[in-house]
Amino acid sequence: MLNNEYKNSSLKIFSLKGNEALAQEVADQVGIELGKCSVKRFSDGEIQINIEESIRGCDVFIIQPTSYPVNLHLMELLIMIDACKRASAATINIVVPYYGYARQDRKARSREPITAKLVANLIETAGATRMIALDLHAPQIQGFFDIPIDHLMGVPILAKHFKDDPNINPEECVVVSPDHGGVTRARKLADILKTPIAIIDKRRPRPNVAEVMNIVGEIEGRTAIIIDDIIDTAGTITLAAQALKDKGAKEVYACCTHPVLSGPAKERIENSAIKELIVTNSIHLDEDRKPSNTKELSVAGLIAQAIIRVYERESVSVLFD
């Protein structure tokens, strides 16, 4: 717990159904109770939300990742924003540990939508005044918004785990980006661990199908740490792990901020060359979707610090610079 001075303040933290455990942990760290609200569904699937305490003039923070089921959690968030606006909240700050639709950030083919921008429009129109996000798939998504965005990074949390793990010697490691788009992320982790990096040249013939083509960098005899922002069906990460072992990697670890882990991900990871998968709790992970070799790290402390700094009108940049 960070402190107790916010118990009777105008700071309010609410949780929807996306990740109640994380929201509770954040509230505990801030030192206040979660705000009282009910989230119900009518028999036809419509969502009904009621805020069960006064928030007039309050700085409200709504914690809700738009993870599976994505559309349900997104609608919950939009309805809650509207409820807060109509209840005269002073500010409506949404905390989105995982931003669904972030992978649809551009027109990859003709006649495709840019759904990440559409979601940004919906959030702004509903009435949000600020968003705190964690490891957006494409950092330029911040430019889709006209409201302030505080973009937190999960890499330092992952790096601390590897530095503290007695079974891992950073001097014998190599950080691996599973594609060219993740090089900046891999470089940041490598800079913290003071290790070299490698890049996997990957080509994706169609969605959720990946093919490893080539590895750029020295792998043989080293412990490989693959880092990505999202692991979805785990096709990319497991093919990468096998390619690294084939190139002589001593061991292979994988890590990500957002464990979407859909479809065959659990089985693929458990049957892969990955010794351990390190993820954060940005997405609630049911036990039936969690591979047996998974270790979960908490982002609650990072989010709690961001909330307090926003509430106190202090700089948030110290958390991600």
Curated annotation (Swiss-Prot):
The record's listing under InterPro entries reads: PRib_PP_synth_CS, Pribosyltran_N, PRibTrfase_dom, PRTase-like, Rib-P_diPkinase, Rib-P_diPkinase_bac
Task: List positions binding D-ribose 5-phosphate.
Answer: R204, D228, D232, T233, A234, G235, T236
Q: Which Pfam families match?
A: Pribosyl_synth, Pribosyltran_N
Binding of Mg(2+) 1 occurs at H137
Q: In which pathway does it act?
A: Metabolic intermediate biosynthesis; 5-phospho-alpha-D-ribose 1-diphosphate biosynthesis; 5-phospho-alpha-D-ribose 1-diphosphate from D-ribose 5-phosphate (route I): step 1/1
Main EC class the enzyme belongs to: transferase
Record-listed ATP binding positions: D44, G45, E46, R103, Q104
Catalytic residues? K202
Keyword check for Acetylation, yes or no.
Answer: no
The reaction(s) annotated as catalysed by this protein in its Swiss-Prot or TrEMBL entry are: D-ribose 5-phosphate + ATP = 5-phospho-alpha-D-ribose 1-diphosphate + AMP + H(+)
UniProt GO BP: 5-phosphoribose 1-diphosphate biosynthetic process; purine nucleotide biosynthetic process; ribonucleoside monophosphate biosynthetic process
Q: Which UniProt keywords apply?
A: ATP-binding, Cytoplasm, Kinase, Magnesium, Metal-binding, Nucleotide biosynthesis, Nucleotide-binding, Transferase
Which Cys-Cys disulphide bridges does the record give?
A: none
Ranges annotated as spanning the membrane: none
- EC no. given is 2.7.6.1
Can you state the subunit structure given in the record? Homohexamer.
The record describes the protein's role as:
Involved in the biosynthesis of the central metabolite phospho-alpha-D-ribosyl-1-pyrophosphate (PRPP) via the transfer of pyrophosphoryl group from ATP to 1-hydroxyl of ribose-5-phosphate (Rib-5-P).
Output this protein's name.
Ribose-phosphate pyrophosphokinase
